[in-house]
């Protein structure tokens, strides 16, 4: 299915952009299921690769959606690509989103910043700098 195809692509991908429409102030059910399955089955292929997230809404709910999406890159040591504002656009239809000048500008910033970060990573690799090897962290429960 879609997730298995994504896992295969993730093996050779340099970076990721995860975006979703906003449904009831959260990521769409499809995106949530996709991300949960991708993280569980293919998380090791996400590790240390840059990620950008973005959300599109008619009106509101984008910040809670971004908060939901950011959890995945944070869990897998993925450098998070940012811009000068929260990565969101507004509109019910593609042509309406294009009228969101500020949101579209932030999306272009994400693209430029992603390209810059990928160049920095490649330059680092060429000079013997690799990502840290983090030891396995202890797993604890709140109730003992």
Question: Could you tell me what each predicted segment is?
Answer:
Residues 1-85:
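Helix-loop-strand module that forms the ligand-binding subsite of alpha/beta enzymes
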Residues 2-5, 79-144:
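Glycine-rich phosphate/pyrophosphate-binding loop and the adjoining helix
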């Amino acid at each position: 299915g879609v997730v298995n195809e994504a896992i295969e692509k993730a093996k050779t991908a340099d970076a990721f952009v995860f975006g979703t429409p906003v449904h009831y102030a959260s990521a769409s059910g499809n995106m949530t299921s996709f991300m949960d399955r991708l993280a569980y089955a293919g998380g090791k292929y996400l590790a240390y690769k840059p990620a950008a997230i973005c959300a599109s809404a008619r009106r509101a709910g984008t910040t809670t959606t971004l908060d939901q999406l950011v959890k995945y890159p944070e869990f897998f040591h993925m450098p998070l690509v940012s811009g000068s504002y929260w990565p969101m656009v507004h509109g019910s239809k593609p042509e309406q989103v294009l009228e969101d000048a500020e949101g579209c500008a932030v999306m272009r910033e994400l693209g430029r910043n992603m390209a810059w970060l990928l160049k920095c990573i490649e330059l680092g690799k060429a000079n013997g700098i690799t990502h840290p090897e983090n030891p396995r962290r202890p797993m604890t429960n709140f109730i003992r």
